[in-house]
Amino acid sequence: MKVTVNRKAHFNAAHRLYNADWTDARNATVFGKCANPHYHGHNYELIVSVKGEIHPETGFVMDMKILKSLIETEVEDKFDHKNLNEEVPEFKTLNPTAENIAVVIWNKLRSKIDENLELSITLYETPRNFVTYSGV
């Protein structure tokens, strides 16, 4: 029997969506206000979901204390109150869209979580705009 456990986290970060190969006009057309050269910020909500079999001895799919610690060290400490474009190495050459942020977070956590467990990342950029990435 597989069960999914979820852990919520939050971080605040600034970013700018743009393509350096495009003109300012094209960036503004494609990314709108998000292309502001002075950046803008979001209060991100993150849901990390881990799915797997319940361990017969512990009753856990995954120890939530371990998951909490991984999220703190791999996501919150690295992204919270940061300018993603300027301060997070992965986004020096990768546009920090919600989609790309979710993939980066998934990659950071995947190697730290038992390979027998499924991992899914849901990232809310706003209460109505969110993405989910499951590594597929």
Which residues fall in each region the model found?
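Charge-rich, low-complexity N-terminal segments
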Residues: M1-V136
